Amino acid sequence: MPRHHPLLSLLSIVCVIFVAGCERYAVTLNERPIYTPKVIYSGYNIADPALASCVKQALIEGNITQPEQLEILNCSFAGVRDLSGIERFSQLKTMNLSNNQLIDIKALLFLGELRQVNLAENPAINCMDIDTLEELLSNATIAAPVCNKPL
């Protein structure tokens, strides 16, 4: 029966803890990279500061390294006015944009993977834009402000 060395076990545990604790750092050996951590995606341009802040937080929390990885975005009560630039995240499936100051939602028309969109409590959104969004995303569930449509 092989003899188990406690020192070897302890060294193994220390190595695992060290590597796990350094996942955010590049590891090199003789100046050659052994491990380089993935960088959070930042190649987007969103003009609205509230939306940019919300997207940045979602990218950090989800450890998103590519725009296609972002599938859920919750920006309710964020003060978002403009959605320009959100189309960069083409794989978004769920968006909560309720209780903001949105007027124009045309950027959502470029997000063909959307399955759930909450636009409630954004009273200034154009009803025609909501109708267009519902037509283009016929498989999606869209919660939108009540529109007074002519009879």
Identify what each model region corresponds to.
Residues 2-7, 11-13, 21-76, 85, ...:
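N-terminal capping/linker segments that flank leucine-rich repeat
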Residues 72, 91-96, 116-118, 139-141:
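Conserved LRR concave beta-strand detector
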Residues 78, 100, 122-123:
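Conserved "Asn-ladder"/turn position within leucine-rich repeats
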Residues 80-83, 102:
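Fold-core signature of tandem repeat domains
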Residues 83, 89, 111, 122:
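Acidic-histidine catalytic/liganding microenvironments
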Residues 101-107:
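Charged, surface-exposed interaction regions in soluble eukaryotic proteins
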Residues 112-127:
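Non-cytosolic head/periplasmic domains of membrane-anchored proteins
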